[in-house]
Amino acid sequence: MKITLRKFDTSHLTANEEALRRCEMALELKDRGDYAGVQGVMHPLWDAMGERPNCTGLHASVAAEVLLTVGILTCWISTQCQLKKAQETAKNLITESLHFFESIGDLKKVAAARSELAYCYWCEGELNEARTMFEESLVKLTTEGNTRARALLGLAVVEWSASRYAIALKCLTDNAALFNKITSYALKGAYHSQLAMVLRMLATPSNKNDNLQRAVAEYQKADHNFKLARNPVFRADVKNNVGNILRQLSRYKEAHKYLQEAKRLTGLAKDKARTAQIDDTRAQVFIAEKKFKEAEAVARNAVRILEKSGHQCLLADVLVTHGIALARLKRAESAQFAFQRAIEVAHQVGALNKAGIAALTMIEELEELSSDALYAAYDRASEWLTTSQSQDLLIRLNAAARKVVAKVRTSGSLPQVVAEDPIDAILNKPCDLQREVLKYEGTVIQRALAKANGSLTRAAAMLSMSYQALAYIIESRQPDLLKERTPIRRRSRRESAVPKSPEQIPEQS
């Protein structure tokens, strides 16, 4: 980085020229994954993440370029910073620059800024908004260059994130010629990497080997381009994804080797979010190896890291992995809580495909789900995944449907879920301790009364308490149980005067 700064001579530049040159260099360093370099180059204009750049004395058009650049950098750097509000800051800066470009009628710059804004929304999991913005940008970005390629890649990433793999594949393959002729090695690498990710998700039992081999070939092309771009962070992404493919091929030892190298690279870059992603993959490999304790520990740590960042889609993914590990360890309640958190996190940011996968996985992994929760989970999963083009997901949905039918047949009754909003049955809700204690108390007493055929005397004996204490609890705290006990029969004076054996003494109030 010192070499870069030493070569950066600004003595012959005006303030406006220097600002534009710093922005240009910062974006080049971004493509290399050089966080420190970016901040060093931008320092005179931008002091720190979350702060507004200093545009004093700059021409309005140059100030807009600075705002756009800092917005792009903030969006990018937030992938390794523990700042939940980073994306909001990025959106505000980019939007401000966009408004300036609109005011001077520069439609190309408006489209470019809108494309970068779309990336911010994608990072937050707002897939519908991101898709719309990318599509609107591409209408204006007609020139075959890096800017159009970046917008096309963003659209493909959104479709992949939404599990619309065939659409993502078409977007990438239809524009292969453009990505072949662009000058950015970083963009070329990202193109081949995304194509590999799509091919992997479109693998079916009949084409699995072919698709996975094609994916590995694309990853090799991606690694080559990222090496030319001198970007170790993106190379780590490639190695993480190759590790995932090796897991699918049951080559676990090789998978761990790739993942260790990926984690080393992200560690050098101090990119905590990407490190958590790699730990998610490591946990999945451990699960495949049936090393569930190791998987749970690694996934739990990844959840802890992502909870502190704004990467909700990534958090939802890792929560699902953590839920699987907990379920395999027979910790059903903790597993259900993890799955329900994944559903809630994904649902809140509009990543409905991820919410659907979480609900589907909960059905698959937990045998003791209530009929209501099971039905609600399937109802939501089937709706949220209705546009998915993954053959694997369709097979899993069919298996889940059979499980729901079997549960209904066994229980002999239909689930009592409100049709208008079945999601409530599968979300974690705040717990009122006093209410829950009363509910549990009522359940225990009801069972005792049922076993005692409504006899308060015998129920009290079963519960190791006095008749008077049980009667008081029912009358004061559990009035709904009054109908469960035998009717109170008052004794006449004659009956009271004649001693009787305990078996002959009727229930008293």
Language-model region placement:
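Flexible inter-repeat linkers and adjacent short helices
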Residues: 1-93, 97-114, 134, 138-141, ...
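TPR/TPR-like alpha-solenoid signature
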Residues: 16, 20-23, 61, 68, ...
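Residue signature of alpha-solenoid helical repeat architecture, marking inter-repeat boundaries
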Residues: 16, 61, 66-68, 88, ...
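Residue register of alpha-helical TPR repeats
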Residues: 20, 58, 65, 112, ...
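Short coil/turn connectors between adjacent alpha-helices in alpha-solenoid helical repeat scaffolds
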Residues: 27-40, 74-90, 119-129, 159-168, ...
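Tetratricopeptide repeat
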Residues: 38, 44-48, 90-97, 117, ...
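Amphipathic alpha-helical segments of tetratricopeptide repeats
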Residues: 43-54, 94-102, 106, 135-141, ...
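Bacterial C-terminal helix-turn-helix
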Residues: 417-509
